[in-house]
């Protein structure tokens, strides 16, 4: 806030804990460097050179400065959400030095139509985060970011409904949980959020994707339970809105008994 440039170090490669910590949805205040040390079972090894922090375990370290007035255009290019990103101005890193260890490996992954190599990261994140999510989002039972949709654009969630149990069952507390999910951390990047009531079907799981959709579609009142958030902030890579980082989101909430019977077979004329 007080300087016209700041120093940046990019770490590439190193132990798996480095790459995994970089993509982990960590709570506010817990740095990726600290989490990498927790995963590795020892502190993050680093040293200082010319005012830059260098990882002692990385395959490559790229150092440079980012100037606040040094914007240059980037794009257009394709991205993992399926859109073709337009050209925009972004900050520029002016590289000073590139360091590497002996016989370094440049790490990368293949992305595209799921499942791809990065799908394994998503699966592992779910395993680690699932027990912690109810503590971060009170009332939540579980949440699942769907890999086939690009992970964060589509969330399936199950939450408890404890408001006014003596009234006719309508989505109430689960809407509070839905707004919490869309207002915090990486779950705020979701474009579509489907949320169901745990008490309606205690055996329901977000990981049984066909079963989850059957549960929601057989209960949802489409005249009442499509909750749009318009003119809000959305993912930078989402070009479905009317501006950059601007668009809409949709919450689909289902609570109560079955109100329609779903078809289980395709008609012969289809």
Per-range role (PLM):
Residues 6, 14-270:
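Charged, compositionally biased interaction regions
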Residues 1-3, 9-11:
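Internal mixed beta-strand/loop scaffold within catalytic domains of large alpha/beta enzymes
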């Amino acid at each position: 806030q007080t300087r016209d440039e700041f120093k940046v170090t990019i770490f590439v490669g190193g132990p798996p804990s480095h790459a995994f910590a970089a993509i982990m949805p960590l709570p506010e205040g817990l740095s990726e460097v600290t989490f990498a040390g927790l995963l590795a079972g020892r502190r993050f090894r680093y040293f200082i050179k010319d005012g830059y922090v260098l990882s002692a375990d990385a395959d490559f370290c790229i150092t440079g400065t980012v100037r606040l007035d040094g914007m240059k255009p980037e794009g257009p290019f394709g991205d993992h959400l399926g859109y073709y990103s337009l050209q925009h101005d972004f900050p520029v890193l002016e590289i000073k030095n590139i360091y590497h260890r002996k016989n370094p490996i440049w790490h990368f992954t293949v992305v595209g139509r799921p499942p791809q190599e990065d799908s394994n990261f998503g699966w592992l994140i779910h395993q680690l985060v699932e027990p912690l999510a109810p503590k971060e989002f009170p009332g939540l039972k579980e949440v699942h970011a769907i890999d086939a949709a690009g992970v964060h654009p589509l969330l399936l969630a199950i939450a408890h409904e404890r408001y006014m149990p003596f009234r006719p069952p309508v989505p109430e507390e689960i809407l509070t949980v839905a707004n919490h999910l869309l207002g915090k951390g990486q779950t705020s990047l979701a474009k579509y959020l489907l949320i169901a009531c745990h008490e309606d079907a205690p055996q329901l799981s977000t990981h049984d994707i066909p079963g989850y959709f059957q549960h929601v579609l057989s209960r949802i009142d489409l005249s009442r339970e499509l909750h749009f958030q318009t003119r809000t902030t959305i993912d930078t890579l989402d070009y479905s809105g009317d501006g950059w980082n601007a668009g809409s989101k949709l919450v689909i909430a289902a609570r109560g008994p079955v109100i329609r019977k779903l078809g289980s077979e395709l008609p012969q004329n289809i």
